[in-house]
Amino acid sequence: MPELPEVETLKNSLKDKLIGLIIENVELKRDNLRYKLSPLLATEILNTNILDVRRRAKYLIIDFNNDYSLIVHLGMSGRFTLQSANYKTQKHDHVIFDLSNGEKLIFNDTRRFGMIYSFKTDLLEKEFFNDLGIEPFSDLLTLEYLKDKLQTKKIPIKNLIMDNRVIVGVGNIYASESLHLARIHPDKSGNDLRDDEIENLIKAIRDVLTKAITAGGTTLKDFVNGDNKPGYFTKQLKVYGREGQSCLSCSSTIIKIKHSGRSTFYCKTCQYS
């Protein structure tokens, strides 16, 4: 599933190309996504001007000049790409936006776990994103904030940093990578972390996410950016997906365990605490 770096990469690839364009037509090809497409989607943003393209957590947001925004979640296999005017519709295209420059913006989702909504812009944070925690790069992510969130939590730190009510956008891949960089065992209880470990973890999360964004995200199977290009952070993964291989830091063997049904990868030598 695309995480923060993938959505940030998608945003960066689309923003300059979309701002200022007009949505001339919206074609709903297939509404059989996990959350059924609303017929209003075809009319609420019709003939509107694109003001901005931004990200909140793992959501892509496109703002229009009629006080509405398009909210896109890629789910497991969603793709949101720019295509030329002569683009031929594909089997799993769900929504096609015709743009004023002749190009098409396509939402394609093979596994249909994605979602796409239109929503009043000024109500997004209050009603749509009201349960989300803070962004990893926000100044609000401090030792005091995270310590307060962790001090009563007797559950694995890996689960806690993946909780979008605490920090948004840190999915399975980047949780494993961040904990390895911070040298923290993924099973360690959140309330057992020392202050210096919490500070190291915040720094590690930011460092890993920054490197992933710079590399264009991680493509394990489906992810591509708005230009239909994959991400290359896969080549920089230190532990994720490397079960049985040597740790790149100490040569110990990478171990795979499960947390809440998800695969976790770590090094027992580097992540001793």
Curated annotation (Swiss-Prot):
Required co-factors: Zn(2+)
UniProt cross-references to InterPro entries, sorted A to Z: DNA_glyclase/AP_lyase_DNA-bd, DNA_glyclase_Znf_dom_DNA_BS, Formamido-pyr_DNA_Glyclase, FPG_cat, MutM-like_N-ter, Ribosomal_uS13-like_H2TH, Znf_DNA_glyclase/AP_lyase, Znf_FPG/IleRS
Binding site for DNA: 92, 111, 153
ZnF (FPG-type) intervals: 238-272
UniProtKB keywords: DNA damage, DNA repair, DNA-binding, Glycosidase, Hydrolase, Lyase, Metal-binding, Multifunctional enzyme, Zinc, Zinc-finger
Gene Ontology terms describing biological process: base-excision repair
Cofactor note text: Binds 1 zinc ion per subunit.
Coiled-coil ranges from the UniProt annotation: none
Cited Gene3D superfamilies: 1.10.8.50, MutM-like, N-terminal
EC number: 3.2.2.23, 4.2.99.18
Active-site residue list: 2-3, 58, 262
Entry's Gene Ontology molecular function annotations: 8-oxo-7,8-dihydroguanine DNA N-glycosylase activity; class I DNA-(apurinic or apyrimidinic site) endonuclease activity; damaged DNA binding; zinc ion binding
The reaction(s) this protein catalyses: Hydrolysis of DNA containing ring-opened 7-methylguanine residues, releasing 2,6-diamino-4-hydroxy-5-(N-methyl)formamidopyrimidine; 2'-deoxyribonucleotide-(2'-deoxyribose 5'-phosphate)-2'-deoxyribonucleotide-DNA = a 3'-end 2'-deoxyribonucleotide-(2,3-dehydro-2,3-deoxyribose 5'-phosphate)-DNA + a 5'-end 5'-phospho-2'-deoxyribonucleoside-DNA + H(+)
Entry-linked PANTHER family: FORMAMIDOPYRIMIDINE-DNA GLYCOSYLASE
Protein family membership: Belongs to the FPG family.
Subunit-level organization: Monomer.
Described function: Involved in base excision repair of DNA damaged by oxidation or by mutagenic agents. Acts as a DNA glycosylase that recognizes and removes damaged bases. Has a preference for oxidized purines, such as 7,8-dihydro-8-oxoguanine (8-oxoG). Has AP (apurinic/apyrimidinic) lyase activity and introduces nicks in the DNA strand. Cleaves the DNA backbone by beta-delta elimination to generate a single-strand break at the site of the removed base with both 3'- and 5'-phosphates.
Name the UniProt record assigns to this protein: Formamidopyrimidine-DNA glycosylase
Species this protein is from: Rickettsia rickettsii (strain Sheila Smith)
Gene transcribed to yield this protein: mutM
